[in-house]
Design a protein with these regions (language model features):
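NAD(P)H-dependent oxidoreductase Rossmann-fold/reductase module
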Residues: 1-78, 94, 169-334
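Rossmann-fold scaffold of SDR-type NAD(P)-dependent oxidoreductases
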Residues: 26, 99-110, 155-158, 207-211
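A glycine-rich helix->loop->beta "capping" turn
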Residues: 71-76, 93-107, 113-118
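Glycine-rich NAD(P)-binding loop of the Rossmann-fold in SDR/ketoreductase-type enzymes
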Residues: 83, 125-133, 185, 240
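Active-site loop of short-chain dehydrogenase/reductase
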Residues: 101-102, 145-166, 202-204
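Conserved sequence/active-site signature of Rossmann-fold short-chain dehydrogenase/reductase
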Residues: 112, 162-163, 214-215
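Short alpha-helical oligomerization interface
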Residues: 112-130, 175-176
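Amphipathic alpha-helical dimer-interface segment in Rossmann-like NAD(P)H-dependent oxidoreductases
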Residues: 131-149, 195-199
Length: 334
């Protein structure tokens, strides 16, 4: 696994390797997304960063801080409740109106929920945040990701390595819901989807990452101010700062350790590997295979037997077919 020193060495080299970079951060106005966007602004000489979030005040604050850290960058906030797929579509329209290519799509929305809460689109809001809206961003922005000269990357921050069994007729949790199912299904759907996507779009790499325990507003958002404060205090000895998380996630987003399955240019895989860091094994077991299930430190978190069993039963394609059918049903589109 890459050490923090190796992470920082790679991030320092990013500025020389890529003078410009276009990135979209869904959930970029707080927590891990905000921290990673800030690290990118520090590392890349002329970044273009789009932040997608619900809170305009938070968006304005982060934009000010990004401009202060790197005045040569271009920064944009898009207000959107991305628990709604129709809002995702509007946000993507704004991005595609402004950009011809995207190098990084970084998604970190969602929280831990103790109860089910359906949106007016008929999906559990947190399940939408953690899976459906993320995949809608991927689908809508794939032409821009594919247009990147490379390397282009999609990073889904959630629960890599925490997959489990699922009922094939309950992917959307409408048949039955529980706290455990909600977490397991979101993790498993993300991992299966990125395997499908890495095959369908082999010039883009896809990462599903468990970020570790990070000192962010997530605890308060999930359990309220009082409960969140207690949990944050208890977890402090084993948690990391947002700054360290941002550094690690910038590494995952840019290092050549996580290349696409079929790169456009084999010499442009990302920031060249620093000494002691090797090309990662994909969730399929293939080195450099394009779909990566990772721990916070960049090491492999794939549950190999479970994923192989899902693969043998064609679950990556089944999950993606279900995802597209859900988009059609919710959005009433062809």
């Amino acid at each position: 696994m890459p050490t923090l020193s190796q992470v920082r060495q790679s991030n320092t080299a990013l500025g020389a390797q890529r003078q410009k970079m276009v990135a979209v951060f869904v959930g970029g106005t707080s927590g891990i997304g905000e921290a990673t966007a800030k690290q990118m602004a520090l590392a890349v000489k002329q970044p273009t960063i789009h932040l997608v979030g619900r809170n305009p005040a938070s968006g304005s604050r982060v934009l000010e801080e990004l401009r202060a850290s790197n005045p040569n960058g271009s920064y944009n906030f898009i207000q959107s409740d991305v628990s709604l797929l129709r809002s995702v579509d509007k946000a993507c329209e704004e991005i595609t109106d402004k950009e011809k290519q995207i190098d990084l799509l970084f998604m970190s929305t969602g929280h831990l929920s103790l109860s089910k809460n359906e949106t007016d689109e008929g999906l559990d809001d947190n399940h939408a945040l953690r899976y459906y809206s993320r995949m809608r961003f991927v689908q809508n922005l794939m032409p821009l990701l594919s247009a990147s000269p490379g390397p282009a990357r999609v990073v889904s921050i959630l629960a890599g390595g925490q997959e489990g069994t699922m009922e094939e007729d309950n992917f959307d949790l409408t048949k039955s819901w529980s706290f455990t199912k909600a977490n397991t299904y979101a993790a498993t759907l993300n991992s299966l989807a990125i395997e499908h996507l890495a095959t369908a779009h082999p010039t883009v790499s896809f990462l599903h990452v468990f970020p570790g325990i990070v000192r962010t507003p997530l605890m308060n958002a999930s359990f309220g101010n009082y409960g969140g404060a207690i949990l944050s205090f208890l977890s402090r000895p084993i948690s990391m700062s947002p700054e360290e998380s941002g550094e690690r996630n910038l590494f995952l987003s840019t290092s050549a350790a996580y290349p696409p399955a079929t790169p456009k240019d084999p010499s442009q895989l990302g920031v060249p590997l620093v000494k002691g860091v090797d090309t990662a094994s994909a969730s399929t077991g293939k080195v450099g295979g394009g779909s990566y299930i990772l721990k916070y430190d960049g090491s492999n978190a794939t549950r190999e037997k479970l994923m192989a069993d899902y693969r043998a039963r064609s679950f990556p394609s089944k999950v993606w077919d279900h995802t597209l059918e859900t988009f059609k049903r919710v959005l009433r589109s062809d």
